[in-house]
Amino acid sequence: GGEVRVFGTSPREAGTSRRIGVLIEAPGLYGTMSAYDNMMLKALALGLVDPKAKVRDLLEFTGLGQVGKKKTKQFSMGMKQRLGLALALLGDPDLLLLDEPLNGLDPEGAREIRRLIMQLNDQRGITVVISSHVLEQLGKMATRYGVIREGHMVRELTAADVDQECSDFLQVEAANPTLALAVLQERFPNLRFQSMPDASIRVFGAADAGAVGATLNEQGIAVQGLYAHKRDLEEFFVEMMGAEYRG
């Protein structure tokens, strides 16, 4: 079993849930009502007193201040997501939970949602937790990653950790990988090395392919393969999850 704690306490504690805003993948909207009316209805449910100014502020913040009486069923996917974000912000949350906020959006819509999310953190101090499989988009805004498999957090990484894991590297395939690794570590102490399950060696840190190959040849170690590679975020996570399944 496990335990969930939010703000240092149980999420069931009185008042805790009011500090959390939530946007599910497809926000629940009343299609025959305007954005403003949807917001006012949510404000009423939250018990907010005289929420008109707050509603207008949030609609302006999310770029919906000029949509007027247009019914939300006529909104684009991006507009619906922005309204869902505004609804989630009505209670002035300290923590915002977003489930696939970029799913189904065109590049312009995704960029706009991403900009809003980053503004919420930078300008309003709101912590944003995003559940998503759109790794390319996450890589443009995340500062910390948590990898969940079968309900368990299997690894946490900072953005710096991920950048390092996804940095350029040389892939070295040698006849004697154990000896090759020892030779390279001694010759290039400032580089980082990783032994792979397929017996290849990855060399990180702006390694010179010619120097690496020459060093191994000088020691009589046959080089069977040597090439530069760039691992993107998706490849890194797929490899990591594969390792977790094997491990």
Model-derived features: positions:
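C-terminal coupling/interaction segments
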Residues: F204-G247
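Hydrophobic side chains in well-ordered alpha-helices
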Residues: T16, A180-L184, V212
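Surface-exposed charge patches
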Residues: L41, D57, A182, A214, ...
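Short glycine-rich hinge loops at helix-strand junctions in the catalytic core
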Residues: G63, F188, G220
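ABC transporter nucleotide-binding domains
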Residues: G1-I130, L135-R149, M153-R155
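ABC transporter nucleotide-binding domain
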Residues: R114-F204
